[in-house]
Regions:
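Short, charged interaction patches at domain edges and termini
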Residues: 1-23, 68-78, 122-170
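Small/polar-rich, solvent-exposed N-terminal microdomains that initiate assembly or binding
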Residues: 1-71
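Short glycine-rich, low-complexity/disordered patches
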Residues: 25-39, 112-132
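Generic detector of low-complexity/intrinsically disordered segments
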Residues: 39, 47, 59, 120-123, ...
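Short connector loops at helix/strand junctions that flank enzyme active sites
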Residues: 58-60, 78-82, 150
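Active-site-adjacent structural patch at catalytic or cofactor/ligand-binding sites
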Residues: 66-68, 78-90
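Extracellular/virion structural assembly segments
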Residues: 76-79, 90-116
Length: 170
């Protein structure tokens, strides 16, 4: 059996976060519908985004994410990662709302991971053990996007990939 190396805890967590942000009406997916693509654009984007995407998101709140640290513990089956989410908006109220939601959703460590696991939204090839808020930055003018404010939320996650009998990813 060949492992699917495209599965990544960070992108699986993104699926869950997007669903929750929609469910709590923090984001309206209709505001992110692209006529050019004929589909909804998920405004939680990897750090390398195209100029076209910046133009599409002009003036719209969105989140950019990246992996900022990864290591395995003494138990080599458990991975520990830090994921940086940078929230952008022209309105400080939007940033506060998203930051407060993420704090509430992910501060509960094992229970936060359980919610993600049981959501049915993430791959069954990853098991989340713990998710918590490791750091939150204050809101400030964005250095990357003129006219936007930004704030960072760093989540630390512990998880494992489901393994075969030899300890390799399934």
């Amino acid at each position: 059996m060949t492992a699917n190396y495209k599965i990544d805890a960070m992108t699986e967590l993104r699926k869950f976060l997007w669903n929750q942000l929609k469910e709590y009406s923090i984001f309206d997916p209709e505001e992110y519908y692209s006529d050019n693509l004929g589909k909804e654009i998920i405004p939680i984007l990897p750090v390398q985004q195209s100029a076209e995407m910046n133009q599409f998101l002009s003036g719209k709140k969105h989140i950019v994410y990246d992996k900022i640290g990864m290591s395995y513990e003494d138990n080599w089956a458990v991975c520990c990662e830090q994921i940086l989410f940078t929230i952008y908006s022209v309105d400080v109220t939007d940033i506060n709302e998203i930051r407060n939601f993420m704090t509430d959703e992910f501060r509960r460590m094992d229970d936060s991971a359980k919610d993600v696991r049981l959501s049915g939204l993430v791959s069954d090839k990853i098991k989340f053990f713990s998710i918590y808020v490791a750091d939150i930055s204050p809101t400030s003018p964005s250095e990357e996007l003129q006219g936007f404010l930004s704030a960072d939320v760093v989540l630390e996650i512990k998880y494992s990939r489901i393994l075969d009998n030899s300890g390799r990813f399934i």
